Amino acid sequence: MSCPYAGNGNEHDDGAVPLSNEVGKIYGEYLMLDKLLDAQCMLSMEDKRPVHDEHLFIITHQAYELWFKQIIFEFDSIRVMLDEEVIDETKTLEIVKRLNRVVLILKLLVDQVPILETMTPLDFMDFRKYLAPASGFQSLQFRLIENKLGVLTEQRVKYNQKYSDVFGNDERALHAIRSSEDGPSLLVLVQRWLERTPGLEEEGFNFWSKFQQSVDQFLAAQVQSALLEPVEWAKNYRLMDIEKRREVYRSIFDPAVHEALVKRGDRRFSHRALQGAIMITFYRDEPRFSQPHQLLTLLMDIDSLITKWRYNHVIMVQRMIGSQQLGTGGSSGYQYLRSTLSDRYKVFLDLFNLSTFLIPREAIPPLDETIRKKLVHKSV
């Protein structure tokens, strides 16, 4: 079967088919396979004590880094599209497509961990001494992914030093780190986008006011139902549960409470952005909110998959070196990695918690004709 990327069939002297007459590059030249396939330098081989599984270790991590590069490429393009005052529907569709691509890449990376686990702890010990002081903590691209996604420096777990210190005097790496910290992250850009959600305007549909009224009516109906409970302890339990729910809703309706939660690190979005996310969730069946809802869902998928990847990495490290040893780069190994599984590393934490504030479908404020027309004719 001929290569689908071939041109008119003209061959080089070695029998290879060029991509096209114009470019004049064969498959290996185009992909620079001479460099790519010659980049596996086994230190155990150089030491005249070759360890077979070191090759797998190198290949697996190089594959990770290649996919990290693609994720960064996608994130950067998405950030450019989001960094506009008005995002039309065609761009929203493209953003959704590229986020979905990142999701599929991350699924692949999660599934790649078991391949590395075919190596036993004893096999790993045979060449582990060659790795120091190298460490996965020194993966520049993974740090860039975290920063571009929206992991804040103050949210990071401290273990020995500032995370960027591991790059020493590497000016290129330090410049990339600073740029990723200073530029608008996906979290910041998505927040700005959500703040512009049509229907939040107080002089217009004023969704937030209507939502508060619906919640008050919903809770009042719950109280009336609880008061009819004939069993005293059951009635008191239901009333107590309703009061707890009222406090939960107060945390989103009271801006001061919300801001306190943001400062504490328990929330990420601004108050208005959270309103936009809730509105999109309620009216996701509306044509204009369909793609935005997909976008928010994909952001949660990305967060979830990165957490799954971290978890798989933690389990693999525990299998390979146990839970007491230091990592090859001097980090606290398993203990440090386990600490990164907390919600502090979940960038779009607020999206995961939206279900806390849902109300029954029949209690959702109905859209009036004005906002329906706005959702049909205006980009989000």
Swiss-Prot record:
Q: In which pathway does it act?
A: Amino-acid degradation; L-tryptophan degradation via kynurenine pathway; L-kynurenine from L-tryptophan: step 1/2; Pigment biosynthesis; ommochrome biosynthesis
Q: What does this protein do?
A: Heme-dependent dioxygenase that catalyzes the oxidative cleavage of the L-tryptophan (L-Trp) pyrrole ring and converts L-tryptophan to N-formyl-L-kynurenine. Catalyzes the oxidative cleavage of the indole moiety.
Q: Which UniProt keywords apply?
A: Dioxygenase, Heme, Iron, Metal-binding, Oxidoreductase, Tryptophan catabolism
Assembly behavior: Homotetramer. Dimer of dimers.
Q: Which organism is it from?
A: Drosophila virilis
How the cofactor is bound: the record states: Binds 1 heme group per subunit.
Query: Per the entry, which co-factors are needed?
Result: heme
Q: Entry's Gene3D superfamilies?
A: 1.10.287.3810, 1.20.58.480
Q: Which residues cross the membrane?
A: none
Molecular function GO terms recorded = heme binding; metal ion binding; tryptophan 2,3-dioxygenase activity
The UniProt family comment states: Belongs to the tryptophan 2,3-dioxygenase family.
Instruction: Output the GO biological process annotations, alphabetical, semicolon-separated.
Output: L-tryptophan catabolic process to acetyl-CoA; L-tryptophan catabolic process to kynurenine; ommochrome biosynthetic process
Q: Check the record and name the Pfam families matching this protein.
A: Trp_dioxygenase
Report if keyword Metal-binding is assigned.
yes
Q: Which domain of life is it from?
A: Eukaryota
The UniProt record gives the binding positions of substrate as F57, I58, I59, T60, H61, R128, T328
Under catalytic activity, the entry for this protein gives: L-tryptophan + O2 = N-formyl-L-kynurenine
Q: What is its EC number?
A: 1.13.11.11
Query: What name does this protein carry?
Result: Tryptophan 2,3-dioxygenase
Q: Where does heme bind?
A: H313
